[in-house]
């Protein structure tokens, strides 16, 4: 299980949103490629990037930053936001991106996901962004009636790399993850799962390790790292396979 620092891009800047609200945005001072390089120097094994402008509009507008990051860092990067065609995916791979994340397009065009997962096995990640268990699309602006669990079951048939499951109600709050939601997803798929949303302290990471045996392979963290709630090196120690002690599993919890 690994920590994955997040970089959200808007107008060429690193930003964080509160519960996915574009009107509740906080800008950070470092340039995106400087932030990515900093995460790498601090011990990150992978970086998660979202083009928020593209997620909202469907049109890429931060490619200069994306190309710079791909060139500057020597660790894998995964990117999402407005990725809705084969041409766009091939373009991102040409920049040096390791994996791409499909959200809105996956929901609206399941056949595309099937074809892409065949063409690029284990390089397509499906992003499931949910509020109260139902999927949101187009940068979390539109709310659907589609259950996150139904989508996970359907896409588990394809040769995708992983699912990223984000609980929008916890994202950017630093108040802890929605473990009930995470566990529910893990129980219905054999595809690796990455959790996102709500991590605010090292104890939140420690708590998530109890799901590792169910297939939780990573956790995306943004605001907590930007606000120095803990260091990447501390998180790596907690999540490492060589950690001294696992979280005791409460058998009643998993019953």
Swiss-Prot record:
It holds the Pfam family His_biosynth. Keywords: Amino-acid biosynthesis, Cytoplasm, Histidine biosynthesis, Isomerase. It is found in: Cytoplasm. The active site is at residues 8, 129. GO terms for cellular component: cytoplasm. One of its GO terms (biological process) is L-histidine biosynthetic process. Belongs to the HisA/HisF family. NCBIfam families: 1-(5-phosphoribosyl)-5-[(5-phosphoribosylamino)methylideneamino]imidazole-4-carboxamide isomerase. This is 1-(5-phosphoribosyl)-5-[(5-phosphoribosylamino)methylideneamino] imidazole-4-carboxamide isomerase. The gene is hisA.
């Amino acid at each position: 299980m690994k920590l994955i620092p997040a970089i959200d891009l808007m107008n060429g800047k690193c930003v964080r949103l509160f519960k996915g609200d574009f009107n509740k945005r906080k800008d950070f001072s470092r340039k995106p490629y400087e932030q990515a390089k900093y995460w790498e120097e601090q011990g990150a094994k992978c970086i998660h990037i979202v083009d928020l402008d593209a997620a909202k509009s469907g049109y890429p507008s931060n490619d200069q930053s994306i190309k710079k990051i791909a060139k500057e860092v020597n660790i894998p990067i995964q990117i999402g936001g407005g990725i809705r065609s084969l041409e766009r995916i091939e373009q991102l791979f040409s920049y040096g991106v390791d994996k791409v994340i499909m959200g809105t397009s996956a929901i609206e065009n399941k056949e595309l996901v099937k074809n892409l997962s065949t063409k690029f096995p284990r390089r397509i990640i499906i992003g499931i962004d949910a509020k109260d268990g139902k999927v949101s699309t187009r940068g979390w602006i539109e709310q659907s009636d589609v259950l996150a669990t139904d989508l996970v079951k359907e896409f588990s048939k394809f040769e995708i790399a992983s699912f990223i499951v984000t609980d929008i109600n916890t994202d950017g709050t630093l108040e802890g993850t929605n473990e009930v939601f995470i566990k529910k997803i893990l129980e219905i798929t054999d595809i690796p799962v990455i959790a996102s949303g709500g991590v605010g302290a090292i104890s939140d990471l420690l708590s998530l390790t109890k799901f590792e045996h169910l297939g939780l392979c990573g956790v995306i963290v943004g605001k907590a790292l930007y606000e120095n709630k803990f260091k990447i090196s501390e998180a790596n120690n907690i999540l490492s396979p060589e950690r001294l002690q696992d979280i005791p599993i409460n058998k009643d919890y998993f019953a």
